[in-house]
C-alpha cells in the first residue's frame, strides 16, 4: 500500500511539473476604476463588449448597466451572448457594464430607514440608506460619460437590478424616467421603509411621462413567510395598480 501512495505522489508531482499548453486564460471583459466626485469614492466596474468577427464592420451597441455587478456579471454576459446569437431570439448584442458595490444599502435605497421587512423597528436598529438619488447621478453623469468616451455605444441605455437594486431600478424609472430606455427589475425590495415606494407610486405615477420606456419586472416565488405576508401583497399592488397606469 505504501508503494501505491508513493507512486500516486510521483504521478501527481510529475503531472504538475508539465507545462499545460491548453491553460490559457479566457477573458470575457475588462476591469476599470473611476473616481466619483458625486459619491466621493473610487468605483470599480467591469465591461463586456461583443466581439467583432474578422472581416466584419465594427458595430455600435446598447449598454446594459448591471447593478450588483460582481455577483451577476458572468451569468448575464453568458445570457446576452447566448440569446443575441440564437436564431429564435430578437435580443441584440449589447455592452454590459457591471457596477461593483461598496455600500449597496446606501446606494440602492430611496430613503433612510430603520424599518425591517415587517415594518417594525426594534431597539438598537439604526436608520440607513437613502442614497439612491446620488447613485443615479453617478451612473448618468459620471459612469456613462466614461463609458461613452471609450466604447462603441449607440445611445440606448438599459438598467438592471435585483432585490435592493431592483427597487433602485423602479425608483429611477419613477423619478428620473429619461435616465434609461429600458428598466429590468428582478424581485425588487418593495418592503423597504414600510412600503415607501408603493406610496410614492400612488402620488406620482399619473404625473410622469413613461412614453418610449420599457419595463420588465420579475418576482421570485420562494416559499418564505415574509414573502407571503409582506412581499406578495406589495407586489400585487404594484402590478395591479401602478403598472397599468405606467402604460397609459
Task: Describe the role of every protein-language-model region.
Residues 23-248:
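Non-catalytic cap/lid and distal C-terminal segments of serine-dependent acyl enzymes
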Residues 7-17:
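Bacterial N-terminal signal peptides
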Residues 1-6:
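Positively charged n-region of N-terminal signal peptides that target proteins for export
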Residues 18-22:
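Sec/Tat signal peptide C-region and signal peptidase I cleavage site
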